[in-house]
Amino acid sequence: MKMKPPVEKNEYYDVTFEDLTHEGAGVAKVQGFPIFVPNALPEEKAQIKVTRVKKGFAFGRLIELKEESPHRTDAPCPIYKQCGGCQLQHMTYEGQLLFKQKQVKDVLERIGKLDLSKVTVHPTLGMEDPWNYRNKAQVPVGEREGGLVAGFYQQRSHDIIDMSACLIQQSKNDEAVQAVKDICANYGVKAYNEERHKGWLRHIMVRYGVVTGEMMIVFITRTSDFPHKAKIIEDITAQFPHVKSIVQNINPNKTNVIFGNETNVIWGEEYIYDLIGDVKFAISARSFYQVNPEQTKVLYDKALEYAELQGEETVIDAYCGIGTISLFLAKQAKKVYGVEIVPEAIEDAKRNAELNGNTNAEFAVGEAETVIPKWYEEGITADTLVVDPPRKGCDEALLRTIVEMKPKRVVYVSCNPGTLARDLRVLEDGGYVTREVQPVDMFPHTNHVECCVLIKLKE
């Protein structure tokens, strides 16, 4: 006989919140049945309304707070509750850092089955000023009442919230997005309409070199024509003298994917430049480049510390991207080999190595799980292996290769604690031991957390 859930849709309940989900929603229970409620915090008492009931859990919304958490604060962003970009602005920054450390510990125990009495999970490294950190703004453009709107999508919808400023974006990016929107509106540019697949301007992207002050403007358009091109370029460059590059990307497809395959520089340079520490990077419209360079340096300094390089080591950097970690490692290692599946990223990595005068970094295109075993057969072995995989974590074949190669230490840089925990279990079963985990707050006010992990071969 099927058990009926103890809560009903549209009914009101008085609850106490016990925990947060990894997405940042409050968790309350009615007769042991979990209800997930956005904008609620542990230890808070509230009246909620149930909005959706599933077999094993329900969703609700906050109606009235009766007791507040000491970590509750007023979200400074006026559109925080509508916009889907941040999840934790209603929590003090100290509370966010504690939540992220706890999140990491939880998954290491639950998914990784690690004994945390033997692993040091450090307090989360946060920012002194956790606002205006993003160096890239990428906003959809739409039309409302005959004018252009540009902003972010409302939660769980494709309705654009027009906004003049985003508190986690570099303010220079906000200014540029607004100016480009106004300039385009001035010349009667038509925004792309997703439903009808008509109109021209789909997205505006702005990239900003925080150290160099250089800026790139990218127009993502449905067709390859560019109405009023000369005038629009003239207006942008007059208003923003630090713009070094204006680019058009053409995406003719009926899709949610932002970029199309064709990218053309329509004014200025192909690249802008920025520095992380003393390493210089060339950034194109499509380059993957960390959006918070200040915290990226914190993360990479920790990776260097865990690598313990003395100048005589060979290091392999799996998932090397445009060479960001590789070029930090190359300053202290004898030789660094980087591998990455995206050919354009490897071109960028080689360019960045040249830019920094690195002669001891070598890069190859391919799947890490294919290229690294080939290197192993050729006699290229690593004293230290660094992995910085995408959210899905390391490929199983790569983990098997690591276990076979037996590098003395592995430094794992992760953007997803769940897949990190899964992969650590595989490495532990293969003869490794997890020593230290350092959470880093790369994206304040969101539910994301990065980690740097020191893993050593058992002696």
From Swiss-Prot:
MF term (GO), any: 4 iron, 4 sulfur cluster binding
Residues binding [4Fe-4S] cluster, per UniProt: 77, 83, 86, 166
Domain TRAM, chain residue ranges per copy: 6-64
The protein's Enzyme Commission number: 2.1.1.189, 2.1.1.190
Entries under Pfam families matching the protein: TRAM, tRNA_U5-meth_tr
Catalytic activity field: uridine(747) in 23S rRNA + S-adenosyl-L-methionine = 5-methyluridine(747) in 23S rRNA + S-adenosyl-L-homocysteine + H(+); uridine(1939) in 23S rRNA + S-adenosyl-L-methionine = 5-methyluridine(1939) in 23S rRNA + S-adenosyl-L-homocysteine + H(+)
InterPro entries referenced in this protein's UniProt entry, alphabetically: MeTrfase_TrmA_AS (IPR030390), MeTrfase_TrmA_CS (IPR030391), NA-bd_OB-fold (IPR012340), SAM-dependent_MTases_sf (IPR029063), TRAM_dom (IPR002792), U5_MeTrfase_fam (IPR010280)
Keywords linked to the UniProt accession: 4Fe-4S, Iron, Iron-sulfur, Metal-binding, Methyltransferase, rRNA processing, S-adenosyl-L-methionine, Transferase
Catalytic center residues: 415 (nucleophile)
Any single biological process term in GO: rRNA base methylation
Binding positions for S-adenosyl-L-methionine per the UniProt entry: 290, 319, 340, 388
Function (record text): Catalyzes the formation of 5-methyl-uridine at positions 747 (m5U747) and 1939 (m5U1939) in 23S rRNA.
Family listed: Belongs to the class I-like SAM-binding methyltransferase superfamily. RNA M5U methyltransferase family.
The name this protein goes by in its record: 23S rRNA (uracil-C(5))-methyltransferase RlmCD
Species for this entry: Bacillus subtilis (strain 168)
Gene for this chain: rlmCD
